[in-house]
Curated annotation (Swiss-Prot):
Source domain of life: Eukaryota
Membrane-protein topology: Peripheral membrane protein
Keywords per UniProt: Cilium biogenesis/degradation, Coated pit, Coiled coil, Membrane
Coiled-coil portions: 75-98
Name the record gives this protein: Coiled-coil domain-containing protein 32
Disulphide-bonded residues: none
């Protein structure tokens, strides 16, 4: 056992003697024989308040006894454990930027589809002014041209003029053949 030199005297003391001064609750060798045979812990403090507090004050500061309370970071710790458990189970609910963009794109598409499919009377009024069907169709075509069917005017515009001239001639030939 290592010996320590005391500041008060020039005599050296053993480690056990120093611990006995610091913690007066250590059993004496004479008491050890009696206490070995019986269970002596009563789950109470081994020394009353005030006794041994002078020796303890010299070595370290004792925290005041408080009722149990969760630590300040216990909620953070529990949240991290729950997060790890979800990750292990594969129930990771963390939303990534890719997931956000995908969800927003899907919501945008659904809104446009709903807008283009619905034919409500409120759509035909813009700021209290009557708006005809062609204006609404023009607006829809401008927003999403691939979603709106073309009308007869647009079909006539797309057909080249020479094929339109051939159609009446083709109709006349079967009529002449019947005569």
């Amino acid at each position: 056992m290592k010996m320590f030199e005391s500041l008060d005297s020039s005599a050296t003391k053993s480690g056990r003697d120093l611990w006995a001064e610091i913690c007066s609750c250590l059993p004496n060798p004479a008491q050890e024989d009696v206490s070995n045979n019986a269970f002596s812990d009563s789950f109470m403090d081994s020394h009353p308040a005030g006794e041994g507090s002078m020796a303890a004050a010299d070595s370290a500061v004792q925290p005041a006894l408080k009722p149990w309370a969760p630590l300040h970071d216990s909620e953070v710790y529990l949240a991290s454990l729950e997060k790890k458990l979800r990750r292990i189970k594969g129930l990771n609910e963390e939303v990534t930027s890719k997931d956000m963009l995908r969800t927003l794109a899907q919501a945008k598409k659904e809104c446009w589809d709903r807008f283009l499919q619905e034919k409500l009377a409120s759509e035909f009024f813009v700021d209290g002014l009557d708006s005809d069907e062609s204006t609404l169709e023009h607006f829809k075509r401008w927003l999403q041209p691939d979603k709106v069917a073309i009308n007869t005017e647009e079909v006539q515009f797309l057909i080249p003029p020479e094929s339109q001239a051939e159609k009446p001639e083709a109709r006349d030939e079967p009529a002449a053949a019947e005569q």
